[in-house]
Amino acid sequence: LPVDQYIGGIEHAILHLLYSRFFTKALRDLGYFNLNEPFNGLFTQGMVTHVTYKNKKNEWVEPKEVEEVDGVLKDMSGISVDIGKIEKMSKSKRNVVDPNDIINSYGADTARWFMLSDSPPERDLQWTDTGIAASFKFMNKLYEFVDRYKSYSPDKINDHETIEFLKMAVNKVTENIETFQFNKSVAKIYEFVNILNEALNSRILSRDNFTWSLKKLSIVLQPFVPHLSEEIWSGIGSDTLCINESWPEEKIDKRAKVKIAIQINGKTKEVIEIDESIKKEGVLDLVKNNEKIKRNIKDKKLIREIYVQGKIVNLVVK
């Protein structure tokens, strides 16, 4: 004692926290040890929620028993179903999703990825079929790197900037894990993958740096999707286990850095730090691969790109 970090839902605050603090202080007062608090840190995670359903008999209906027939929601017996509130998953309201069904359909890694990527861990997470399907699609996209690795050959190698971007992404993954901002770590992994894909499509990445990139990717994926991480690690020819590798601490090329404000229609949405020497094309590529910016311009038409060197990128969309 004390425990470094207590992680638990707010519903346990009375039983677990109150009693443990009471006994700690009682034992302190009795002279058994000199300790005021049993936990150094406290983190309360959010709940997993799901939409609720009720049929015309006022009975709760499980999500998997609901289907759309001619534009009307019905249960398995054909009775019309009404959509209720989004609430914490509970057996009483039958708004639960069987983990075995998810694992059998998508795999455990997909479930982990979706739950860690969709919202900050201190907030509630709404479970959706579209969300889990999108995560599954990304898992397959990650494994495609193994096939690309086997057949890849570079053209004109020019990958210094790419590697520096990837190093920065790796370091950001680490920073966000340490502060429990797992969704931000996931966003940086998306960014890593997008940058790597662009380099491969342009064939500017050397074979050695492709190997380096996939090794780093496998390691930072390990806390999120451990099974897929090992598959990628093995797929590029490693005969060890990825989980036994040391966590990467990347040294960034110590060139001058500048902060760039990214605007959409004149409104600042993100601020990033980049190498001062990066040319306009490289800056715009980095901006367009930023996950937050991609979400903001999704389904919109890009009209114009304005770049004020070392200061601002403004994307005009409609």
Regions found by a protein language model. Name each.
Residues 13, 18, 22, 32-38, ...:
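Helix-rich, typically C-terminal accessory recognition domains appended to large enzymatic cores
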